[in-house]
Every structure is written in structure tokens, then in C-alpha cells.
């Protein structure tokens, strides 16, 4: 069994050693909750990695969106190359939930596009938890949705070893039972094929490696792993576990028992609807449910089988669903990253789901058991936590109230200070801001501006463009990929000014930014709360020459608190730097808190340097292309898809230029 072991040239510095010791001690003392209060750029991820190494517990890291989850996953893969680091997020590229609108008598069928790659990663995550303890799973909030019973998942897993007395047809029957399909032509993930005495399987947790079971009569003679694309043998296996192709797979016995319970619930519900004189609803429910029962009986599943998950799991009505958290051992450790944003998301999930299901049940589209196919309530989520570390630069009241220990991480390894904050009047703010933009851009830096409305962001962008400023805006209407493209352009210098609303808070760490301007800073509310202001100020904490300008006519309580907190941190940082002779420096290369897509400015420099070096050393272009292709495959394997895309473009350029 592997142990967590960090591979890094860095050692904990600044506040990191103290924070690590404090939190590890608290966890070892059995405390349930603790908080890591770490400022932007202080190396919170590295601190988390050190805590994992010291405590040696299976770990779940909860992030508030897919982009940050992917970024964290890539970072932890670098820190723990010899351990298992998995990515678990919603597998829907597109999702339209089942719904009914009574006012217009409109039923909307469930419509979804499932991302096969992410589904594979989800299976890889649950498989890893069954097999090992040195597992880190980085997940989005979707991990609190029902996933199927882990006990049933374990029970249905097929365990095979060379020398076992197993009939080939018996193994095939078991594969079909756990929802694998036979396909001798289109051999893909979750399928198997039969060639003589050989049974080839592509497990649900992989798409590039297959398992070949070689039989000799009724005995397993040999188990080999092979490359699905080339067919080449990779190696021999002494044991293999084939996990179900669906997290909702169930044994024949469980399905038969479940069908009887569904039929009983249907009978009870039809009596209720008939008594209420809802004849149409009763007929609709009977027809839809009987169709589902027939599908389950014949195929082992039906469309929307998750709506019967409570019955399949054998749970009582109203009890919480089984989720990813139930796949972890009891002593697992959880980190909630950016907890001030993530926890409110967890709280909101249940209410939205419940309101949609109510009309489906009332109007005969679903049985009441559909209510129990839901995300966890916040109280249920809390009950499943063993030990947790809340991670945030601005933890909320909940985190502080539920923490025995709060470890501050204020010193940055780079020596960078929290920025200077200036307050200027709102009168003439745009003209003043234009002058500041010009001075900042002339020094080769970038500007972030935060407004209160989308309209203002768009109008200000147009105004600045008319003055020949390279400006663009970013708000919630802009999707993730477009957002990453904008950040890339900002880092490259194709854009000098980025204007946004609350999107300029968490996860936008750009070292080139030397000015953050907060317009209408004295308009008290969600976008100008103490937490929002501190997070926005943090965007200027990556550059040694940065500053923040708040345009306001009054100093609100939130402004006062955020300014005082920033000044408090700044004093601590200055004293530490003075004591240890540290000069604050802007570090662009090697800063790991940057979203992978934004590293393009570094990559462009690196690429140009590589080409120059190759030319000097007379390295053939073909050799350079080969090196980049290997790096591209490795980046894709490590979920660094934007990096892989950049390398693909570089390879394309090299091929065109070498013609």
C-alpha cells in the first residue's frame, strides 16, 4: 500500500511550517473542524499537500467550480506523482433536467450530453477508493449528488486472478449483469469482445488500456494488460478488479426486490391520485412506471433509473442518498477550498432540486421516491464529514464557529506584500482612472476594474476602446472557455484592461496586474461586502508594484474592515521581510496558483527560447516536434488541456515553418 510522498523542489517557508504544524496537530488531536486562513499567493495548495503527507489520510478536496477543480487536480498530480490523484466533477456537457410547468401544461423531457472522458474519470475515482488508501480526489460540489450504493458497487466488482477456476461464459454473464456490453466491432470503454479463448475488456475507468483474460478450459490461464489503440501488450497482471460500467448497477436479486417495492409504491400512489380525482395523473403515472419496470426487468436499467435509487439502495423514504463521500473510508480528510464560496453552494443545492421534483410527483410524472434522488441537505453533508480543513483568505462565520483551530498564512514565499490601498472621490472617477490606466500600461503592466453592473462593464469597455485602450469585459454570460481565452489575452498583452463584476474575485491570479480599481466601492452590498473587497484586493497581490484604488465618497463598514485587515497583513509581511532580509519580487514563472490556461505568456517565451536554442545546436525540427508531441500527450494525461492545446499549436507552427 503506497504512502503519500510529496515530490517537490520547494520546502515550506514563511508561515507555511507553522500553519502545517498547527493544522496537523489539530487533526491528530481528533478535532473535527479547522481553518487555514491563507492570503492570495501564500501557497495554500502546498500547505494542503504537506498536511496530506503528514496525516496519511485518504483526502477529498472540494472546489466550487470545474475550472478550479481541474487546476487543483493538476497541482496535486505534480506534488504526488506516485500516488493516486483523481478528478470528480459533473459529467454533463449539457443538462436539461426533467421538469413540468403546470401553468402551460408543458412537460420537458430530461436531455443531457454526457462527457465520456469525465465519466471515465469518475469511475476511475471510485475504483481507486475501493483499491487503495493513498488517494486524493479533487471534486466539485456535484459530489453531493446521489451516486449509487458503494456496498453494491463493491459487491458487483469482478475480481479475477490467474489460476482461478472460472468458466468464460460465467464471466461474460457477470459482465453483462454489471452493464458491460458485448461489441466485437466498436471496442470502447465499458464494452468487451470475445476472440476464441480470450476475453478482452475495456474497464469503465479506462479508455486507453484494456484487460485480456486468457482461458484454458474452465481456468484463467493468464491476465494481460494491452494498449487499446495498438494492441501491444503492456504487461502481465496477477490480479484485476473490473468495476461496474454504471454507478447505479445492481444485482439480479436487488433488481427483483426493487421491482416489487416500486410496484407497491405505485399501487399506493395510484390510490392517492384516484381519491383526489386526478384520473389523468394516475393513468400517466401507471403507464410511465410500468414501462420503467419492464425496462429494468429486461435490461437491468431504464432511462432515469436514478429516480429509483432510494429503492435500489434499500433506503427508507427521506433518508440521504449515497454519494461520493460514502465511498471514502471513515477516517478520510476533507479540504473545502475557497470555503466562503463553496459552502453557500452546498447549502443551495437541495432547495432548487426539491421545488422542481414537487410538480413532477404531483402531476403523475414520477413516484414520490424521486424526491430521494437529490443532493444532500446541508445538515446531511455535515454529518458525513469526518475531519475538515476550511481553506479561504476570507473564511465566513460558519467556518470560524466550527473550527477548533485557525492557522493564519499571511507571509508569501515571494516576500510580496498586500497592496497599498488608495481612496479617491467618485466625482471624476473615470477620467482619473483613464490616467492611471495609461501610467500602468506604459510600465508594461495590466489593469483589473470591477464595476457593479454588466451594463456599466460593457459601457466602460466601449468608452475605453474609443480612447484606444485595449480593454475587454468579463461577466457571467461569458462561458468558461471564453473566459480562459480572455485571461490568456490579458497575460499576453493583447488586452491591457479587464473589466468585470464579481468574476474578478476568486481564482484570477495574474502576476502582470499592477492596478486593481474598484468603482463605487461605497455601495454597501454583496459585491462590496468585506469578503468581496478582500478577495478583489487579493487580485493585486501578485505584483510587487501593484496598488488598489477604491473610488468612494464615504468609507463603509466593509471598506473600513477590509482596509484595516489588508494593512494588518501588510505590517506583518513587512516585519517578516525586514527580519529575514527579503526583497519582494514579482514571480511569474513557477507560480502554481495560476489557471493552466493563463500560462500562455510563459509558454510563448519558452517556445521562442527553445526554437532559438535548437537552431544554435543544429537540432533537427523533426526532433523538436517529437519532443513537443511527447510533452503534449503528458499534459493531456495530467488534465492540463489548455497546455496541451498550446503545444498542439506550437507543433502546427513548427511543421508549417519547416516546409
Swiss-Prot record:
GO terms for molecular function: ATP binding; ATP hydrolysis activity; DNA binding; excinuclease ABC activity; helicase activity. The beta-hairpin motif is involved in DNA binding. It comes from the Bacteria. GO terms for biological process: nucleotide-excision repair; SOS response. Forms a heterotetramer with UvrA during the search for lesions. Interacts with UvrC in an incision complex. The UvrABC repair system catalyzes the recognition and processing of DNA lesions. A damage recognition complex composed of 2 UvrA and 2 UvrB subunits scans DNA for abnormalities. Upon binding of the UvrA(2)B(2) complex to a putative damaged site, the DNA wraps around one UvrB monomer. DNA wrap is dependent on ATP binding by UvrB and probably causes local melting of the DNA helix, facilitating insertion of UvrB beta-hairpin between the DNA strands. Then UvrB probes one DNA strand for the presence of a lesion. One of its GO terms (cellular component) is excinuclease repair complex. Belongs to the UvrB family. Its main location: cytoplasm. Keywords: ATP-binding, Cytoplasm, DNA damage, DNA excision, DNA repair, Excision nuclease, Helicase, Hydrolase, Nucleotide-binding, SOS response. ATP binds at residues 38-45. This is UvrABC system protein B. Residues 25-182 form the Helicase ATP-binding domain. Residues 622-657 form the UVR domain. The gene is uvrB. Transmembrane segments: none annotated. It comes from Clostridium perfringens (strain ATCC 13124 / DSM 756 / JCM 1290 / NCIMB 6125 / NCTC 8237 / Type A). It is found in: Cytoplasm.
